[in-house]
Amino acid sequence: CGMTAVINTGNDPNWTGHDLAAANLYGYGRLAFETALSPETIAAEWIRLTLGEDPLVRENVMTILMMSWPTYEKYTAPLAIGWMVAPYNHFDPSVDGYEYDRWGTYHRISHSAIGRDRSSRGTGYSQQYFEPLALMYDRIDTCPEEMLLFFHRVRFDHVLSTGETLLQHIYNTHFEGVEDVERMLALWQALEGRVDEAVYERVLGRMRFQLTHAKEWRDCINTYMHRVTEVPDEQGRKIYD
């Protein structure tokens, strides 16, 4: 057996463009030798080796790194629905970007439901897994919610384990995603003067851009869902019509 990965290195002096993204590359190398390491252990090592021993730096950067993945998931495509990106860059939001070409059929959104049925009652994709995974993914009530819309077509009024409807979950997570980026930005700004100035400014610029981009994703996704379903956000937050 072996390991392989897709790594976004480039011509930047720090290789990864975003200084904090180097933690992923470090983690890949560490897992190649010790496969049982936890994300927290890897992150703690990388922070200490890269940014030093300052307790506030270690605490804040650890929080940022542990938040980054779930935060991105919150404000982009919900519950494993698939690509909702612009075809020209795979980065900006575009709900129907790939929906109507030969690579499409990711979300099949209607006024009442969303998702592609890949269960045994649909395309049968779930049956490519060995048991017990095949049965687990095949049923809505046992499929992990983080994978729900990849394997199933689900009504917007379906109630999740949180007690939210599916549609309200989409609204909530996209607002929460922006709030999480704001929190990460504040955590980094608290480190001014505690890390190398050039590193601080590069990461600050990236995080400010991420906040702008998260707001764009939030507004595009929530507006699309609202227009299709005509169901308002229960909390009355701003959704553009």
Language model features: what each stretch is:
Residues 1-241:
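Catalytic domains of carbohydrate-active enzymes that cleave complex glycans
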